[in-house]
Swiss-Prot record:
One of its GO terms (biological process) is regulation of gene expression. Residues 11-136 form the RNase III domain. Homodimer. Its main location: cytoplasm. This is Ribonuclease 3. Mg(2+) binds at residues 49, 122, 125.
Amino acid sequence: MKGRSLNTEDRARLEAAIGYRFAEKERLDRALTHSSARSGRAINYQRLEFLGDRVLGLCVAELLFQTFTDANEGELSVRLNQLVSAESCAKVADELSLHEFIRTGSDVKKITGKHMMNVRADVVESLIAAIYLDGGLDAARRFVLEHWTHRAASADGARRDAKTELQEWAHAKFGVAPKYRTDDRSGPDHDPRFTVTVEVDGIAPETGVDRSKRGAEQVAAMKLLEREGVWQKRSAGN
């Protein structure tokens, strides 16, 4: 959807899909507006995304704390990182068909492929913030629980920390320690993307991308463990 605001029919369809009716319709419009759609720092979803990331983290952390009463802090952190990742948020966006409503500008071609996944994830966080501002924490929590409760139940929390697992596996199999290299940092300060490569002597490296350097290291370690058959690869539905 290039440029234009939601019409009455589209707004009703989207509000029905997300299960929330906005009192201030402009909040929903802003949550769907990519920075390419208009000039001006206050018209797009970037500020909402910043807030929505924190609201999502709080609601999911609360869900995990109440659900997995015997899990320690490390196990809860692994689950949390899985559930609030860009990949998970993008899947929620796909379930809601948010791509049909995202407002973009003339440089829409710049947000295709992997970056488009990040855009879909960002819009979900922006939408959570818009709901929070419009209806309060309870409304935002209801949305998060609707779309993350089943994901929390299926998240592979039995896994250990990927970097720790890779460290022990690499030492036992090759007698070496993994080496991590930061290849790239992109994106604005409030929403960076780190690309990290992990190398273990004797086998091909793997690369991970995440919003934090540590998260990217975890993704790279996880991908290497899955590729080498140390961990079973997660299904696409989780």
